[in-house]
Design a protein with these regions (language model features):
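A sequence/structural signal for flexible, mid-protein segments enriched
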Residues: 14-330
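Sec-dependent signal peptide recognition
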Residues: 1-4
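C-terminal motif of bacterial Sec signal peptides marking the signal peptidase cleavage site
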Residues: 9-12
């Protein structure tokens, strides 16, 4: 046994090969990141790329020309300007420590509308111009919202339905938020945990099914109409809750997953275009299995629709519905 181990070790050492890699120089490009929403003015962040082998970090581009077009007007409908009043911190991990990069929005005065295409063009004298397009679909009406707080005291059951469009591919996202009142009348918002056995939410997570009894557990879900194209679709969700807190504890401790001390739960239901779905779907795959580890693996790229550059320019048509209003705790 010792002889076999020794031979294996010698053989392994003899098979080692050193490869010299010649990495081509990196030419920085503009990076565009932005999400158009029908509830707010257009806003994007412009930065530049760095080499994967560089020790430098991307930085904000302050003197770019950012023009917004729609599918009706030939000329730009808006010119986005830097909003220095609101700092945007972009988090990243550097040698196992989380750090932040300071960025700012280029913001316009146009509020995008649904059922329309938008294109953005970014120009800068030191970089090649970039562009990207996105489509904002029409909103979907939510019907028959039902709340169940009786069947299980540890769960809030939520169900609703909507009519899917039979003439096109549709993409959706569901998120839940808790809205709590703090001292001084200010509001605090947190993400809610969603539990569901809805088949259209994707592949079954057998680990979650074994321990929770649900095929889906998460803070948000992105899905398509593949299993219900053109149908009147019913969605059922459960939200786990904790015990009531004493009123004296209300202002001292706000836990985003303890809903009984909050006065409202908000349902956010969004419709997407295919580019937005591609981004969120690839981002989820990248987070789950895209990083290389000591055993190797295949890097899953994150979707980008920016021509001649990097980043993503996508859109969402979101509606928020308060589904469980109750008096605020005093």
């Amino acid at each position: 046994l010792l002889l076999i181990f020794s031979l294996t070790l010698i053989f392994s050492c003899d098979m080692e090969t050193i490869i010299d890699l010649e990495v081509p120089p990196h030419k920085p490009v503009l990076v565009l990141n932005g999400i158009l929403d029908t509830d707010t003015t257009a806003a994007v962040v412009i930065s530049h790329s760095v080499s994967a082998f560089s020790t430098g970090n991307p930085s904000f581009i302050q003197d770019a020309e950012v023009l917004l077009f729609d599918d009706i007007e030939e000329n730009p409908i808006d010119s986005l300007k830097i909003d220095m009043s609101n700092l945007v911190l972009v988090n990243y991990v550097n040698e196992y420590q989380q750090e932040s990069l300071p960025m700012y929005y280029y913001r316009g005065i146009t509020i995008p509308t649904s059922d329309k295409n938008y294109r953005i063009v970014v120009n800068h004298p030191d970089y090649s111009s970039i562009s990207a397009s996105t489509y904002i679909p029409s909103s979907i009406e939510i019907n028959n919202i039902s709340i169940d707080t009786i069947t299980d005291e540890e769960l809030i059951g939520v169900s609703f339905n909507f009519q899917d469009d039979p003439f096109k591919k549709d993409y959706y996202r569901i998120k839940m938020f808790t809205s709590c009142e703090k001292k001084g009348g200010k509001r605090s918002r947190g993400d809610a945990i969603l539990l569901s056995n809805e088949p259209s939410f994707g592949s079954i997570n057998f680990f979650e099914l074994l321990f929770t009894g649900y095929t889906f557990v998460g803070r948000e879900v992105v899905f398509t109409d593949d299993l219900f194209d053109g149908q009147n679709k019913n969605i059922s969700l459960d939200i786990p809750v904790d015990k009531y807190l004493e009123p004296s504890e209300y202002d001292e401790k706000i836990d985003e997953e303890n809903y009984f001390k909050c006065d409202t739960i908000i349902l956010e239901f969004s419709t997407f275009s295919d580019d937005t779905y591609s981004y969120y779907n690839s981002l989820s795959d990248h987070d789950e299995k895209g990083e290389l580890n000591i055993f190797g693996g295949e890097v899953v790229p994150v979707y980008s629709n920016v021509n001649n550059g990097l980043g993503v320019f996508i859109s969402t048509n979101a509606q928020e519905v308060p589904i469980r209003p109750r008096p605020a705790t005093k």
